Swiss-Prot record:
Ligand binding (substrate): N127, T177, K181, R298, H330, S382
Cofactor entry: Mg(2+)
Pfam families, sorted: RuBisCO_large, RuBisCO_large_N
UniProt name for this protein: Ribulose bisphosphate carboxylase large chain
Enzyme Commission designation: 4.1.1.39
Modified residues (N6-carboxylysine): K205
Organism, scientific name: Porphyra purpurea (Red seaweed)
CC terms in the record's Gene Ontology section: chloroplast
Family named by the database record: Belongs to the RuBisCO large chain family. Type I subfamily.
Length: 488
């Protein structure tokens, strides 16, 4: 049960006897707290400073992320303080790690503005990460109540509508990022788009840092890219697209670029995570109003999500971005060049795609989550993947994903079209083997070799990249498995 009236009265009396008292005694720790359905829950990994009790550290985090300051203030008496104080209610030691603890904290829903990621984050991650009582702090997971989720739009388009719009079913989407990401002229850029799409890809995309530089202004890029899309679509008889990056210095500039992308016929536009939560939500609202797919590149996330003891787990970003309303987000490959533990990435993908998730500690899911019918976000796998890994990608990531082969398309010795064809044939041969009931994971290399007998570009790709892998142990691994998993 929650604290009794007598207990609360005693605590209130005690806290006004002195200027500074421990957070736990101020009401920010309640081991008997009964969680409400409407509470927002957060799970922090805390590393207290030497000599700081983990319960006091947890209470301090609860206090500083809700109503507290460093000393008693009499104006607390003018508010419903017992309601508005966040409550740390559980502290568990992190398995097999000394001096780290998982702190569970509950926040009343009325502490947050409806439909605002900016307001949510101002409390949850706004000030507490610099707090001296903790040596390090990491936000691992959150649970959003249905009542709160219903105040958010969610993905502008969603997976189901995107498949219908693209007329692509029963397999992952195929894409590639234009390379080199910087330096091409508009005409050459458009040629890359055309070649990749004509060779069999569904999408080409801008990279995170191509905006409107002196070597190629944004209008030039948009026009040449869409010329490539239209010509390739006509030649292939398929619906195709190119992610036009509308990221810019101001919202006015982004709206202008997004409107132009719509005018020239694009079905999808792109933004970067670094534009900020308010800008992301604003663009998601625009995308839904204008019937556009919205792709989000997670540029900058590893500055705070990669280290295991401080920052924020990427699964939290996945949750916030599903609420904010993006349709795509880069979420890891497992086998590529970027950070990606298999169990962690499975948790990211489930967060983006599932209507409801249960507690799954090996995947880092600390709370059950009902997504209140918000649409699905399509995960994007990119960074160091190639055709020879197709069986692993299909096994780890499933069908509901965009597989993006940048260097694995444009680096093909026989040209961009050949690289795209190699990836398309590799994917379709693997999907066919799976649908026939074969053990496509164990037989994957042989399935690819058989397909390559009638596809020269695939054979060339397999020969070129057969020895390429990125076998590094991930820095962010599961806490609840015996042996940390690694890239394979």
């Amino acid at each position: 049960m929650s604290q009794s009236v007598e207990s609360r009265t005693r605590i209130k009396s005690e806290r006004y006897e002195s200027g500074v008292i421990p957070y736990a005694k101020m009401g920010y720790w309640d081991a008997d707290y009964v969680i409400k359905e409407t509470d927002i829950l957060a799970l922090f990994r805390i590393t207290p400073q030497p000599g700081v009790d983990p319960i006091e550290a947890s209470a301090a985090i609860a206090g500083e992320s809700s109503t507290a300051t460093w000393t008693v203030v009499w104006t607390d008496l003018l508010t419903a303080c017992d309601l508005y104080r966040a409550k740390a209610y559980r502290v568990d030691p992190v398995p097999n790690v000394a001096d780290q603890y998982f702190a569970y904290i509950a926040y009343d829903i009325d502490l947050f503005e409806e439909g605002s990621i900016a307001n949510l984050t101002a409390s949850i991650i706004g000030n507490v990460f610099g707090f001296k009582a903790v040596k390090a702090l990491r936000l691992e997971d959150m649970r959003m109540p249905v009542a709160y989720l219903k105040t958010f739009q969610g993905p502008a388009t969603g997976l189901i509508v995107e498949r219908e719009r693209m007329d692509k079913f029963g397999r992952p989407f195929l894409g590639a990022t234009v390379k080199p990401k910087l330096g091409l002229s508009g005409k050459n850029y458009g040629r890359v788009v055309y070649e990749g799409l004509k060779g069999g890809l569904d999408f080409l995309k801008d990279d995170e840092n191509i905006n409107s530089q002196p070597f190629m202004r944004w209008r030039e890029r948009f026009l040449y890219s869409m010329e490539g899309v239209n010509k390739a679509s006509a030649a292939a008889g398929e619906i195709k697209g190119h992610y036009l990056n509308v990221t810019a210095a101001t919202m006015e500039d982004m709206y202008e670029r997004a409107e132009f992308s719509k005018v020239v016929g694009s079905i999808i536009c792109m933004i970067d995570l670094v534009i900020g939560y308010t800008a992301i939500q604003s663009m998601a609202i625009w995308a839904r109003k204008n019937d556009m797919i919205l792709h989000l590149h997670r540029a900058g996330n590893s500055t705070y999500s990669r280290q295991k003891n401080h920052g924020m787990n990427f699964r939290v970003i996945c949750k916030w971005m599903r609420m904010a309303g993006v349709d795509h987000i880069h979420a890891g490959t497992v086998v590529g060049k970027l950070e990606g533990d298999p169990l962690m990435i499975k948790g990211f993908y489930n967060t983006l795609l599932a209507g409801e998730t249960e507690i799954n500690l090996p995947q880092g899911l600390f709370f059950a989550q009902n997504w209140a019918s918000l649409r699905k976000v399509v995960p994007v796998a990119s960074g160091g993947i190639h055709a020879g890994q197709m069986h692993q990608l299909l096994d780890y990531l499933g069908d509901d994903v965009v597989l993006q082969f940048g260097g694995g398309t444009i680096g093909h010795p026989d040209g961009i079209q050949a690289g795209a064809t190699a990836n398309r044939v590799a994917l379709e041969s693997m999907v066919m083997a799976r649908n026939e009931g074969r053990d496509f994971v164990a037989e994957g290399p042989q399935i690819l070799r058989d397909a390559a007998k009638t596809c020269g570009p695939l054979q060339t790709a397999l020969d070129l990249w057969k020895d390429i892998s990125f076998n590094y142990t991930s820095t962010d691994t599961a806490d609840f498995v015996e042996t940390p998993t690694a890239n394979v």
